[in-house]
């Protein structure tokens, strides 16, 4: 399924504050939603409700921790394939059915589907890419990480 760009009015000032603040971290406390919500002037329940809405409208695809698979003996790999436009959504569903797929994005390029694999072992990258190739009949191009970059995400408040 392709994601659509949200109109600016889809997010209010509170939504934008939530997105910006939670990029900075999340409290590791007995009641983290209460504590994160308080920093935003919300109750924990209101924060959860907002996060559920942001996910429902496609402003976020998930909410949860980001684990460094490589630091735990696993691996990450950026992958791409060239999916026929007429079959794009079906192929995306096959790719996304793999729990190792962390992100999947459509791009205007010959390699029009880009996704990240995160596996428990370095060998898992080749194994998962091979399963995706077998299921889709398409070549999965692998672009392993050479250097790590941290890109900050901010929305205009």
Swiss-Prot record:
Domain of life per record: Bacteria
Catalytic activity field: siroheme + 2 H(+) = 12,18-didecarboxysiroheme + 2 CO2
UniProt keywords, alphabetically: Lyase
A Pfam family of this chain: NirdL-like_HTH
Gene Ontology MF, one: lyase activity
Pathway linked to the protein: Porphyrin-containing compound metabolism
InterPro entries linked to this entry: AsnC_trans_reg2, HTH-Siroheme_Decarb, NirdL-like_HTH, WH-like_DNA-bd_sf
The keyword Ribosomal protein is assigned to this record: no
Enzyme class: lyase
Enzyme Commission number: 4.1.1.111
Family: Belongs to the Ahb/Nir family.
Described purpose of this protein according to its UniProt entry: Involved in heme d1 biosynthesis. Catalyzes the decarboxylation of siroheme into didecarboxysiroheme. Siroheme is probably decarboxylated to monodecarboxysiroheme, which is in turn decarboxylated to didecarboxysiroheme.
Self-association state and partner proteins as the record states: Forms a complex composed of NirDL, NirG and NirH. All proteins are required for the total conversion of siroheme to didecarboxysiroheme.
Name listed for the protein in its UniProt record: Siroheme decarboxylase NirG subunit
Organism in which the protein naturally occurs: Paracoccus pantotrophus
């Amino acid at each position: 399924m392709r994601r659509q760009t949200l109109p600016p009015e889809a997010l209010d000032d509170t939504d934008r504050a939530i997105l910006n603040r939670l990029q900075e971290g999340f409290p590791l406390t007995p009641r983290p939603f209460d504590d994160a919500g308080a920093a935003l002037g919300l109750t924990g329940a209101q924060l959860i409700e907002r996060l559920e809405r942001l996910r429902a409208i496609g402003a976020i695809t998930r909410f949860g921790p980001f684990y460094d698979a490589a630091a735990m003996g696993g691996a990450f790999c950026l992958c791409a394939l060239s999916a026929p436009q007429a079959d794009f959504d079906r192929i995306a569903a096959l790719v996304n059915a793999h729990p190792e797929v962390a992100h999947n994005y459509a791009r205007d390029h010959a390699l029009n589907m880009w996704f990240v694999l995160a596996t428990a072992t370095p060998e898992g990258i080749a194994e998962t890419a091979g399963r995706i190739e077998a299921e889709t009949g398409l070549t999965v191009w692998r672009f392993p990480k050479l250097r790590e970059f941290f890109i900050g995400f901010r929305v205009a408040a």
